[in-house]
Amino acid sequence: VIKHSKNRKNISDFSLNDVWSENKILKKDFKKLHGFFWLFTLDLNSSKKDVQNTLLKWFKKYHNYNAYSWEIDLLSKRIISWISNTKITYEGSDEIYKNEFDYLIKKQVNHLINEIDRSEKIDDKIIGCAAIILAGVSFNDKTKFLNYGLSLLKRIINNTFDRNGFPKSRNLRQLTLFLKYFILIREWLKESQNDIPEYLDEIIYHLGQAYNLISKDSAATFLFNGCLLYTSDAADDET
């Protein structure tokens, strides 16, 4: 889900002056930039000031809804990235910055809650669900985020998997994606000392069994429905 680069980069290695410029960039690059998963590639010894200044520029320019930078998948990844990297995105900042950071996290989560049921993309739903739950365990005053996230998680599981715990789509890439995010959610709940729902443990078990079975053939594997050839290595590289 979250790739950690073996060769960590320092924030000072990047040119940040025009990072949020209006210059046209490819949609793929735009999504990578605004999803903020690049934060996971940074050395934690990077300058907190530089990282936070970069976020502050984003705060000022994109704090209101924008159809492009507030897409569900970008919004979800951004929430996960900001919260997961608080050592460089939050710690050591002044109260004004912290208040703005907290406000924008909550604003984005509220928007996500209002929009996620309208999305027809199951990938967006699970990433969004994970982001809502992470916000819920990160803010003491936002148990409603956690409660909503867990309720959404249960609905996703009920609607997406068959009685044996297999994705109804029979898609290996989705199996891998769900397994990774479910494990992340369980770890966040455990670390925050929240109860782990039995249904989450059960689906992780079933998906893990399926993944282990399929991964034994590391060269190539057909999807469960036999329609397409898909490599397990490629699945690992997806998200």
Residue ranges and their predicted role:
Residues 26-204:
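Aromatic-lined, polymer-binding surfaces characteristic
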Residues 230-239:
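Single conserved hydrophobic/aromatic residue that forms the stacking wall/gate
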Residues 210:
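Metal-ion/cofactor- or nucleotide/acyl-coenzyme-handling active-site neighborhoods
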Residues 12-23, 27:
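Long, low-complexity, highly charged intrinsically disordered regions
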Residues 213:
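Anionic-ligand-binding alpha/beta catalytic cores of soluble enzymes and soluble regulatory domains
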Residues 218, 222-229:
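N-terminal leader/propeptide and maturation segments of large enzyme subunits in energy/redox metabolism
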Residues 1-13:
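Extreme N-terminal leader/anchor segments
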